[in-house]
Regions:
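N-terminal leader/targeting and pre-domain segments
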Residues: 1-52
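Non-catalytic, surface beta->alpha helical segment in thiol-disulfide oxidoreductase systems
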Residues: 2-17, 112, 117-156
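Sequence context surrounding c-type heme c attachment/ligation sites in exported
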Residues: 49-51, 73-76, 80, 86-94, ...
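Thiol-based oxidoreductase modules, predominantly thioredoxin-like and allied folds used
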Residues: 57-62, 84-101
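Conserved redox-active cysteine motifs that mediate thiol-disulfide chemistry
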Residues: 62-73
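Extracytoplasmic/secreted cell-surface and envelope-processing proteins
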Residues: 68-69, 99-101, 126
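Structural alpha/beta surface segment adjacent to cysteine/selenocysteine redox centers
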Residues: 100-112, 119
Length: 156
């Protein structure tokens, strides 16, 4: 369970959390406007419905992070439209130095957040790191369908 940690004149979450907590105050101040203004393309939603079957998702994010503020609400709205069960997603809120007291990030090479990691049968299919290369929907389709995809920090 995430804990609320003082951070200047605000609080941040650290540890495992869920989207319900991120939609509540004070985080709703940044979550709601982006969520309400984003409309996923219906054709992408239909494609993602089948591609998301049996896929597990882990999200590393920061309630203090502007990139998380920009991407997370869109991610939630997209998954809701694709009828993916949000409650099964592992959401991990990190400190400003991108760590957790429980070391959830160990061995996962989390360098930038948000990081969305997609797994099938325990094998990583790919990840979207910090921001989408094309757009969130297109990047997810590429990762989940096995098309060539390099996230923004994959320079190999």
């Amino acid at each position: 369970t995430a804990v609320r940690v003082p951070d200047g004149n605000t609080v941040i979450l650290v540890g495992t959390t869920d989207f319900a907590e991120l939609r509540a105050a004070p985080f709703s101040d940044w979550f709601d406007p982006v969520y309400l203004s984003f409309t996923p393309a219906p054709e992408n939603v239909e494609t993602l419905k089948s591609l998301l079957e049996d896929v597990e998702i882990v999200v590393f994010m920061g309630t203090w992070c502007e990139d998380s503020h920009r991407e997370l609400p869109k991610f939630v709205k997209l998954l809701e439209a694709a009828e993916y069960p949000l409650e099964v997603i592992e959401v991990i809120a990190m400190t400003r130095d991108k760590t957790t007291p429980q070391d959830y990030e160990a061995g996962l090479d989390i360098t930038n957040i948000p990081t969305f990691i997609f797994y099938k049968d325990g094998v990583e299919l790919g990840r979207i790191v910090e921001f989408a290369v094309e757009d969130l929907e297109s990047d997810m389709i590429k990762v989940l369908s096995g098309q060539p995809y390099k996230h923004a920090y994959d320079w190999d």
